[in-house]
Amino acid sequence: MKAQTTSKDSLILRQEVVGARRPSNYFWAVIVSIGGLGFLLAGLSSYLKVNLLLVSDTSALQFIPQGVALLFYGTAGTLLAIYLWLSLLWNVGGGYNEFNKETGKVKIFRWGYPGKNRRIDLDWPLEDAQAVRAEVREGLNPKRELFLRIKQRRDIPLTRVGDPMSLSELENQGAELARFLEIPLEGL
């Protein structure tokens, strides 16, 4: 999440939030695509008794049970790859957090899956912001997130989902946001 202050007299703070378009997601989409397509072609080769792969000859495999298993895993892998590529295309989870002192609004925007809730656009008055809360949990599944506490609402997550940010980055962004909004920073 990159924070950049824009507009005259630093009255607008806009933080971009990276969604599904992270390098690790591109890597996994390519790997799963290659693996799923390879298994699918190997299963089809054993059924059709024609070699469809460039790297090995799987047409000699028995269709039952090896070919069926390859076909099943290939279909599952290909469907997972399609899901990953569509998530990347739609940039699910991407968006921005905008804190605007000119209009007195907090705006949280995220992209979702196509349908009724494709655009997730939340607005609150700036004076309803009570605090910036940092949540840090270490261990096997570490969690480092920033939340905005809003009056009479649940805490709103501000950071990206996925790989946790460094503790210093979390502190800096939390302190910058708390300073900009002139509210306390909790949890550190």
Swiss-Prot record:
Source organism: Microcystis aeruginosa (strain NIES-843 / IAM M-2473)
Its topology with respect to the membrane? Multi-pass membrane protein
One GO cellular component from the entry?
photosystem I
Keywords of the record: Membrane, Photosynthesis, Thylakoid, Transmembrane, Transmembrane helix
Q: Does the keyword Coiled coil apply?
A: no
| Subcellular localization | Cellular thylakoid membrane
| The protein's role, per its UniProt record | Seems to be required for the assembly of the photosystem I complex.
What residues form the membrane-spanning segments?
26-46, 70-90
Q: Write out the similarity annotation.
A: Belongs to the Ycf4 family.
Superkingdom of the source species: Bacteria
Q: Which GO terms describe its biological process?
A: photosynthesis
What gene name is listed for this protein? ycf4
HAMAP family membership: Ycf4 (MF_00437)
Q: What is this protein called?
A: Photosystem I assembly protein Ycf4
